[in-house]
Amino acid sequence: YLQSAIRSVAFSRLWAMPQVEGYDTIVIYGDREHFSNVDYFTGYDARWEETLLILPRHGRPSILVGNEGIGYVKKVAVDIEVEFFQTFSLMGQPSDRSPRLKEILERRVVYDGGKIGVIGFKAYDASNHTVGGFITDVPHYMIETLCQVVPRDSLENATLLMADCRYGLKHCVSAKEIVIFEAAGTRISRGVLNCLRHLKPGMRE
């Protein structure tokens, strides 16, 4: 219930933002340490793998998952199409049953002459760096593959759509979401308190 209540409006909320004007598709990268942006829309935790969430303005969203994720993603409570991309798995695991990244992106990324937003971990001020143009922390091979599908100059770091303190989706919550977060936090803290109150010398896990 918590997942569906929060995320049922996440996609429409994104595309209703004035800051997404001109974007054809938003591509969101996540991994073990940085999956909150993907989680915001889907509830999916990449665990020890990587993941890529593709959100076209027109069309169904899709998510790329690895060997472990192909089973875990079934628990996602939103309507989303799943692409099996084994390169996102841990090293040494099978990688012979999924298409190449370019083939997937050609099917999933919608480009109508607008911008392609790329969301990674951080937004970057170009004035602080000696590299020009598009700056992102999304893995290089993914960006280069994306550039085989859409023009390089269409890419734009769109991380502020999630993280900007003034308008970022993760910083602007509804009254309903506040209630849900408070209820979840209270339930967890009570569970911890209950555990501590019942600890006794000599107890084992």
Predicted segments, located by residue:
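Short, intrinsically disordered, charge-balanced linker/junction segments flanking boundaries
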Residues: Y1, P201-E205
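A composition/biophysics-driven feature that prefers long, compositionally simple stretches
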Residues: Y1-R190
